[in-house]
Swiss-Prot record:
PANTHER family: BASIC LEUCINE ZIPPER TRANSCRIPTIONAL FACTOR ATF-LIKE (PTHR23351:SF14), FOS TRANSCRIPTION FACTOR-RELATED (PTHR23351). The lineage of its organism: Eukaryota, Metazoa, Chordata, Craniata, Vertebrata. The modification Phosphoserine is found at residue 43. Transmembrane segments: none annotated. Residues 28-50 are annotated as: Basic motif. This is Basic leucine zipper transcriptional factor ATF-like. The gene is Batf. Signal peptide: none annotated. Heterodimer; mainly heterodimerizes with JUNB. The BATF-JUNB heterodimer interacts with IRF4 and IRF8. Interacts (via bZIP domain) with IRF4 and IRF8; the interaction is direct. Also forms heterodimers with JUN and JUND. Interacts with IFI35. One of its GO terms (cellular component) is RNA polymerase II transcription regulator complex. Induction: Up-regulated by STAT3 in response to DNA damage. Induces by IL12 at late effector stage. Down-regulated by STAT5 in follicular T-helper cells (TfH). Keywords: Activator, Cytoplasm, Differentiation, DNA-binding, Nucleus, Phosphoprotein, Repressor, Transcription, Transcription regulation. Coiled coil: none annotated. One of its GO terms (molecular function) is DNA-binding transcription factor activity. GO terms for biological process: defense response to protozoan; DNA damage response; DNA damage response, signal transduction by p53 class mediator; hematopoietic stem cell differentiation; isotype switching; lymphoid progenitor cell differentiation; myeloid dendritic cell differentiation; positive regulation of cytokine production.
Amino acid sequence: MPHSSDSSDSSFSRSPPPGKQDSSDDVRKVQRREKNRIAAQKSRQRQTQKADTLHLESEDLEKQNAALRKEIKQLTEELKYFTSVLSSHEPLCSVLASGTPSPPEVVYSAHAFHQPHISSPRFQP
C-alpha cells in the first residue's frame, strides 16, 4: 500500500502541530515569568541591601557629627579660657606693654618664666 502524500509532507514540516505550538508557548511563558520573578527578587534584595548600607553609613556619620560637635564645644571653651587668661595677663606683662615689636623668640622666652595660667589642672595632658 502506498503512503499518502499527507503523511510524508508532515514529516518534513518545520512547524509543530497546532496543539504542540500552544504547549511550547505556554512553557516559554512560564519560563519567562520564572526568570522575571527571580530577577525581581534579586533586584529587591539589592535594594534592601543598599538601604541597609545607607542606614549604617548614616548612623556612623551621625556619631561622627556628634563627636565633632562635642570637640567644637570643648575647643570653644578652651578659647574662652585662654582669651580670659590673655586678657588678665596683658595689663601685667612688661613685654607686651613696651609697645616695641619683638621677635617671637624673645616674647616666648620672656614669658617662659611666668606661666601660672597654663599650669591650670584643667588643661593638663
